[in-house]
């Protein structure tokens, strides 16, 4: 039989643990302070939970009409890098890039962001309940007439326990998650077929669509780099990319490629096999 004193002691310990957890969470600011850089500012947006995933956000605020680049900058520009320094309580993390805009000018075609940008980062933690002091290294370009590379480090805190964030909701971060390109639920395909061409000695991939599209970006290919050669039009029924091998001796026929497709009021990912 448990004595009253033991019950009081157990209750006291539980209350102490609860207060310690509350104190940990309350000691973490909702967002880090803005850090000033060339024509831009940086901060970390605090954690939120979406579909049982713990998310933070890298917030980049661009000044005076400047822009920065997507994970694939396109024909020119500065390829960004976002890295969380190793920590034994982080199993892995995944940077999730919102859909960019397509910029066509005298320098070619580039994929970029303007104004205020939030890049979600999904964290998988060990859930040990500890307060973590983390460092995020970021490199990106800030561009107008010329591009200036920026390199910075942001220090931030997080509780290593997803349950602490279940009831927490950062509206800005949650709204940005809807901007992450996804595959269509109806599984309808917009890419009808592909053709391989040789135009004046240059290898060209031609993509033919089943309906008019506003734009297309080659999102991922393991063995080839693709370069946009399309003119600036309102709609496209066919689009062409030049390409080159990343590894010598690869055959492009049968290569699986992921594309980001823009329609009038939506965008989505679609995989296809080069025929």
Over which residues does each language-model region extend?
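Extracellular/lumen-exposed scaffold segments
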Residues: 26-275
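Bacterial N-terminal signal peptides that target proteins for export
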Residues: 2-11
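Bacterial N-terminal signal peptides
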Residues: 11-20
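N-terminal signal peptide c-region/cleavage motif recognized by signal peptidases
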Residues: 22-24
């Amino acid at each position: 039989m448990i004595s009253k004193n033991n019950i009081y002691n157990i209750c006291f310990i539980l209350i102490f643990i609860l207060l310690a957890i509350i104190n940990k969470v309350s000691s973490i600011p909702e967002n880090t302070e803005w850090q000033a850089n060339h024509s831009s500012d940086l901060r970390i947006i605090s954690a939120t939970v979406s579909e049982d995933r713990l998310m933070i956000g890298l917030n980049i605020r661009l000044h005076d009409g400047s822009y920065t680049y997507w994970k694939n900058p396109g024909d020119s520009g500065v390829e960004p890098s976002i890295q969380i320094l190793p920590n034994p309580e982080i199993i892995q993390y995944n940077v999730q890039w919102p859909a960019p805009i397509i910029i066509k000018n005298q320098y070619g075609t580039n994929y970029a962001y303007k104004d205020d940008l939030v890049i979600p980062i999904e964290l998988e933690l060990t859930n040990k309940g500890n307060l973590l002091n983390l460092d995020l290294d970021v490199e990106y370009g800030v561009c107008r007439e010329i591009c200036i590379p920026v390199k910075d480090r942001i220090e931030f805190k997080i509780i290593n326990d997803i349950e602490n964030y279940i009831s927490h909701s950062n509206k800005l971060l949650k709204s940005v998650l809807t901007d992450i390109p996804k595959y269509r639920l109806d599984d309808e395909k917009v890419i009808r077929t592909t053709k391989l061409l040789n135009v004046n000695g240059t290898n060209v991939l031609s993509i033919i669509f089943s309906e008019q599209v506003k734009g297309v970006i080659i999102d991922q290919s393991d063995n080839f780099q693709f370069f946009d050669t399309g003119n600036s039009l309102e709609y496209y029924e066919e689009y062409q990319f030049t390409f080159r091998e990343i590894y010598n001796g690869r055959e492009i026929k049968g290569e699986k490629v992921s594309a980001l497709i823009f329609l009038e009021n939506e965008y989505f990912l679609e995989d296809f096999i080069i025929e």
